[in-house]
């Protein structure tokens, strides 16, 4: 299941939205170290699976690594701890 999230403007990073937010294979989000790589930038599956989600494919677009504000994973309803801490926002240039 995917969730739809809107991305707020931070500095010169443009606002955007995505329907593929989450930790699945086609996710636009990569989890790890309380940061995410976000935007329609593609990615590749990660051996660690749902633990950190997909790995950003830098060849598919410019990815901005910025602390996430509140990113809710598709599994957050069953596992509230999958919500990342407050920080900032994200986007792709």
Curated annotation (Swiss-Prot):
Disulfide bonds: none annotated. Transmembrane segments: none annotated. Pfam families: Coiled (PF05710). GO terms for biological process: sorocarp development. It comes from the Eukaryota. Belongs to the hssA/B family. This is HssA/B-like protein 23. It comes from Dictyostelium discoideum (Social amoeba).
């Amino acid at each position: 299941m995917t969730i739809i999230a809107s991305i707020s403007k931070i500095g010169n990073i443009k606002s955007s939205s995505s329907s593929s937010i989450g930790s699945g294979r086609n996710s636009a989000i990569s989890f790890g170290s309380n940061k995410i790589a976000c935007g329609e930038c593609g990615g590749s599956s990660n051996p660690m699976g749902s633990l950190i989600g997909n790995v950003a494919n830098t060849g598919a677009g410019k990815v901005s690594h910025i602390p996430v504000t509140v990113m809710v994973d598709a599994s957050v309803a069953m596992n509230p701890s999958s919500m990342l801490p407050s920080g900032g926002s994200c986007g792709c240039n």
